[in-house]
Amino acid sequence: MPWPLLLLLAVSGAQTTRPCFPGCQCEVETFGLFDSFSLTRVDCSGLGPHIMPVPIPLDTAHLDLSSNRLEMVNESVLAGPGYTTLAGLDLSHNLLTSISPTAFSRLRYLESLDLSHNGLTALPAESFTSSPLSDVNLSHNQLREVSVSAFTTHSQGRALHVDLSHNLIHRLVPHPTRAGLPAPTIQSLNLAWNRLHAVPNLRDLPLRYLSLDGNPLAVIGPGAFAGLGGLTHLSLASLQRLPELAPSGFRELPGLQVLDLSGNPKLNWAGAEVFSGLSSLQELDLSGTNLVPLPEALLLHLPALQSVSVGQDVRCRRLVREGTYPRRPGSSPKVALHCVDTRDSAARGPTIL
């Protein structure tokens, strides 16, 4: 066998099982040359609340406690041998209505936490300050008001992904601007299918991805996205009210590359200047809206635009036609959107600007 292949087999992970708490499954993954490093994944899902606190191996990296009808977790339950070095914890599909402010205080290495599909109604301040979290899933709960500061973590600048979709959130309390109080390092925030009537104040968060899908937003006007200059992907699909897109509503997003407005059938044009300021936008999804046909001035406001989705199977791509050469002084190449219906591959005539 060739040496490179032997090395690949030696370094890649191998999986074996080991003795475990009755009803649980312990799977060992080994890594490195000669299996010199191992981690254990423990699955204790679906056993019932009586299993807590369940003993786990000292080298446990991920613990699955989902679907156990758990009604409470606190610091003492998550402080036994093997718990303090956890990197991943799954508490989804339980009956949790609240969590102790110090519940995760001893999980100093926790990177991924899943609390989805519970009945949480509140999130204590500083819930995650002791853990270097990079992923927090709080979707499908009963949260109504959430403080952005609750997601301040011991991450030392690591990007944080937060999923708050499918809650009852009507207000997001902004992070205070007091000196010396670091802002959460949230780079991806999913607020889809909540009860937000306005774009929340997320100023100064290092956001790159934001989803507000399915919210009853009434208006998106100037200043709505102030302080979010680093945002690259914004999704406003399937909004539950007829949103008004005011001119320059996206002006604060010069770095935005992807904008999704799909699934808003009552959305009408308020003028191409709605998109002014989006100098980096490359992809625009208008499928399922009333924003077709496209206005001729669209590409003038979107100089970097490469593709537009205008229907379930219709995509338009930017087309540059050089025209006659040599070009007349002061003239510019003609720019068009060339649209194709992928169902029948019939091309629509390009719109020349």
UniProtKB/Swiss-Prot annotation:
GO biological processes: anterior commissure morphogenesis; bone growth; camera-type eye development; cholesterol efflux; cholesterol homeostasis; cholesterol metabolic process; ciliary body morphogenesis; corpus callosum morphogenesis
Domain of life: Eukaryota
Annotated glycosylation sites: 74, 137
Segment forming the signal sequence: 1-16
Pfam families, alphabetized: LRR_1, LRR_8
UniProt keyword list: Developmental protein, Glycoprotein, Leucine-rich repeat, Neurogenesis, Repeat, Secreted, Signal
Induction info: By 17-beta-estradiol.
LRR repeat boundaries on the chain: 59-80, 85-106, 109-130, 132-153, 159-179, 185-206, 207-227, 230-249, 255-276, 280-301
Compartments, record wording: Secreted
GO cellular component, one term: extracellular space
SUPFAM superfamilies recorded: L domain-like
GO molecular function: transforming growth factor beta binding
Matches recorded under InterPro entries: Leu-rich_rpt, Leu-rich_rpt_typical-subtyp, LRR_dom_sf
Residues in LRRNT domain copies: 17-58
Function: Contributes to various developmental events and other processes such as wound healing and cholesterol homeostasis through its interactions with multiple signaling pathways. Wnt signaling inhibitor which competes with WNT2B for binding to Wnt receptor FZD4 and represses WNT2B-dependent development of the peripheral eye. Plays a role in regulating the hair cycle by controlling TGFB1 signaling. Required for the development of the anterior commissure in the brain by inhibiting neurite outgrowth. Essential for terminal differentiation of hippocampal neural stem cells.
Additional comment: This factor is named 'Tsukushi' because its expression pattern in chick embryos is similar to the shape of the Japanese horsetail plant, tsukushi.
Description of how the protein assembles with itself and partners: Interacts with FZD4 (via FZ domain); competes with WNT2B for binding to FZD4, inhibiting Wnt signaling and repressing peripheral eye development. Interacts with TGFB1; the interaction contributes to regulation of the hair cycle. Interacts with netrin. Interacts with CCN2.
Protein name: Tsukushi
Species per Swiss-Prot/TrEMBL record: Homo sapiens (Human)
